[in-house]
């Protein structure tokens, strides 16, 4: 099977391509390298077709001619373009990952410099306007009708998409795995991440309200991105990952991708109900996820 992933979100497309190849498929990802903030595309370089924003559409069409499956991540606009170009000769899959369908009212700035904040604010403004246009013109609904299947990466997205199929995020267990011998240095007991979408003050208030007496490191991933290749070593400096996340004032019930990666590395994870979890659940094993995806492709 020849599979072309269009765009990537949080490394999901790259991990799928890697394990699809291990299962004997010809799978690759076309992505704009300038958007590779965390070095994920660089880490999975052998699976990447590099493009610029200017030539992304044309390169996507060129590569799509030889593909059986066009698996589009977030870019619902590409569904129309591919269906118009190829009619029903290609199977088109649309996958949503979170804010691409849920939306977000407010995003934080990295505060590296005034120039940086100005540039990032411009990007945020563009995204909000783009999302408003997509909703107003019912682009998402139309794209979902044109796709052969629509996938969501977390269960909370199911009510937002008619006839959606939930597919767990695959975690690269070759990359995220426990050390054979524990050698964690003495430092803060727990870790949590401050990201563009998260209200970290609500997270800390939650911990205080629930009497969670933890020594927590709050890492600002907006200002200081951690490269994907370095992420396992960084996580394994801690024993517990606090995965309590508020977006637009609402607590998220699903485990974040970082929390899943922490579980794969051997950390405990504190979820939104203050439950401690240990061990990566089997549904996130990449071979299991790709097997489930094959059944979606074959429908």
Question: Model-found features: residue ranges?
Answer:
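Membrane-proximal helix-turn-helix segments that form the acceptor-binding/catalytic region
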Residues: 59-65, 100-103, 111-149
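Conserved donor-binding/catalytic loop of nucleotide-activated donor transferases
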Residues: 236-238, 258-268
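Conserved catalytic-core segment of nucleotide-activated headgroup transferases in glycan assembly
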Residues: 172-228
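Short N-terminal targeting/anchoring amphipathic segment
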Residues: 1-7, 60-79, 93, 240
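Nucleotide-sugar-dependent
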Residues: 243-260, 270-274, 278
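A charged, aromatic-enriched C-terminal amphipathic alpha-helix characteristic of glycosyltransferases
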Residues: 275-299
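Donor nucleotide-sugar binding/catalytic pocket of nucleotide-sugar-dependent glycosyltransferases
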Residues: 130-178
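Short beta-strand->alpha-helix junction loop in the catalytic core
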Residues: 33-35, 100, 156-157, 167-177, ...
């Amino acid at each position: 099977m020849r599979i072309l992933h269009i765009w990537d979100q949080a490394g999901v497309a790259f991990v799928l391509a890697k394990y699809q190849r291990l299962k004997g498929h010809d799978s690759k990802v076309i992505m704009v390298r300038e958007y590779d903030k965390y070095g994920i595309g660089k880490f999975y370089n052998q699976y990447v077709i590099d493009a610029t924003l200017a030539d992304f559409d044309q390169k996507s069409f060129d590569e799509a001619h030889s593909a059986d499956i066009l698996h589009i991540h977030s870019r619902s606009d590409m569904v129309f373009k591919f269906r118009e170009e190829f009619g029903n000769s290609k199977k088109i899959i649309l996958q949503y990952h979170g804010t691409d369908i849920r939306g977000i009212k407010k995003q934080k700035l990295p505060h590296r410099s005034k120039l940086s904040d100005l540039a990032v604010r411009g990007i945020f403004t563009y995204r909000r306007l783009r999302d408003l246009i997509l909703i107003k013109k019912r682009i998402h609904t139309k794209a979902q009708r044109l796709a052969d299947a629509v996938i969501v990466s977390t269960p909370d997205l199911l009510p937002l998409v008619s006839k959606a199929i939930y597919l767990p995020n695959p975690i690269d267990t070759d990359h995220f795995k426990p050390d054979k011998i524990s050698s964690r240095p003495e430092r803060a007991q727990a870790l949590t991440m401050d990201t563009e979408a998260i209200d970290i003050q609500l997270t800390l208030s939650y911990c205080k309200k629930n009497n969670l007496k933890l020594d927590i490191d709050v890492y600002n991933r907006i200002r200081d991105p951690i490269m994907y290749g370095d992420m396992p070593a960084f996580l394994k400096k801690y024993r517990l990952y606090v995965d309590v996340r508020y977006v637009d004032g609402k607590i998220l019930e699903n485990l974040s991708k970082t929390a899943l990666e922490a579980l794969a590395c051997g950390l405990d994870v504190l979820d939104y109900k203050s439950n401690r979890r240990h061990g990566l659940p089997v549904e996130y094993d990449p071979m299991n996820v790709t097997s489930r995806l094959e059944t979606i492709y074959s429908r």
